């Protein structure tokens, strides 16, 4: 189908988002065309602002407006425990549960040889450096229960064991192949309470 150039560009831009195929991108593009100009300008500004105003915490890797992030700055947190997660949405899911009081480390991905992603491509080197310099007694590996998450957890466990830090994994109850961000608070709460040593 031939569209005017601005619509084609907008459709292609929407298709760069995860889970957005050609039909959904087309629907979003035409919806954008029907929006009031002020709303479109606000939407475009929000997209630009999220890239310009947010950064990653230099300590844990979580998205933040200020560096270090509010979690790393919170003196009430248990600094002896770090929960390692794959991405920022996992931190948000864990925080919703309101039971975990330790710190986080965001990997921004998982090891996936099929996709050409190795340990050096995600935030593992900074985790190891952090563990050597901080007073951490437990590392909770909260990767997603899928092949990539399990591979990443095993890799980190092998790296951390020689440092002498207790390494635990969330209890199962999270569905295999599922994503942490979609788990409800009760399931997450039980998984953190029943974590097992690796």
UniProtKB/Swiss-Prot annotation:
ZnF C4-type: positions: 57-72
A GO biological process held by the record: DNA recombination
Gene3D superfamilies: 3.30.60.80, 3.40.1360.10, 6.10.250.240, RecR Domain 1
CDD domains: TOPRIM_recR
Keyword list, A-Z: DNA damage, DNA recombination, DNA repair, Metal-binding, Zinc, Zinc-finger
Domain (Toprim) ranges: 80-175
Cleaved signal peptide residues: none
Source superkingdom: Bacteria
InterPro entries assigned to the protein according to its UniProt record, in alphabetical order: DNA_Rcmb_RecR, Rcmb_RecR, Rcmb_RecR_Znf, TOPRIM_dom, TOPRIM_RecR
SMART domains the UniProt entry points to: TOPRIM
Keyword Zinc-finger attributed: yes
The UniProt record lists the keyword Membrane: no
Gene Ontology molecular function: any one: zinc ion binding
Database matches in Pfam families: RecR_C, RecR_HhH, RecR_ZnF, Toprim_4
PANTHER family per record: RECOMBINATION PROTEIN RECR
HAMAP family: RecR
Family per similarity comment: Belongs to the RecR family.
Entry function: May play a role in DNA repair. It seems to be involved in an RecBC-independent recombinational process of DNA repair. It may act with RecF and RecO.
NCBIfam families, per the entry: recR
Protein name per UniProt: Recombination protein RecR
Taxonomic classification: Bacteria, Bacillati, Bacillota, Bacilli, Bacillales
């Amino acid at each position: 189908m031939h569209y005017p150039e601005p619509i084609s560009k907008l459709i292609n831009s929407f298709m760069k988002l995860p889970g957005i195929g050609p039909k959904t991108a087309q629907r979003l593009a035409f919806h954008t065309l029907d929006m009031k100009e002020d709303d479109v300008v606000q939407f475009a500004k929000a997209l630009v602002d999220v890239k310009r105003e947010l950064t990653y915490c230099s300590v844990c890797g979580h998205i933040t407006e200020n560096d270090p992030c509010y979690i790393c700055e919170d003196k009430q947190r248990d600094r002896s425990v770090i929960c390692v997660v794959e991405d920022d949405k996992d931190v948000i899911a864990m925080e919703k549960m309101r039971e975990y009081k330790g710190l986080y480390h965001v990997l921004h991905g998982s090891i996936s040889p099929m996709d050409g992603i190795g340990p050096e491509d995600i935030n593992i080197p900074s985790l190891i450096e952090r563990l050597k310099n901080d007073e951490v007694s437990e590392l909770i590996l909260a990767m997603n229960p899928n092949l990539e998450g399990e591979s990443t957890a095993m890799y980190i466990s092998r790296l951390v064991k020689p440092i002498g830090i207790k390494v635990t994994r969330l209890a199962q109850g999270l569905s295999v192949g599922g994503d942490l961000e979609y788990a409800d608070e009760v399931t997450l709460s039980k998984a953190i309470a029943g974590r097992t040593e690796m």
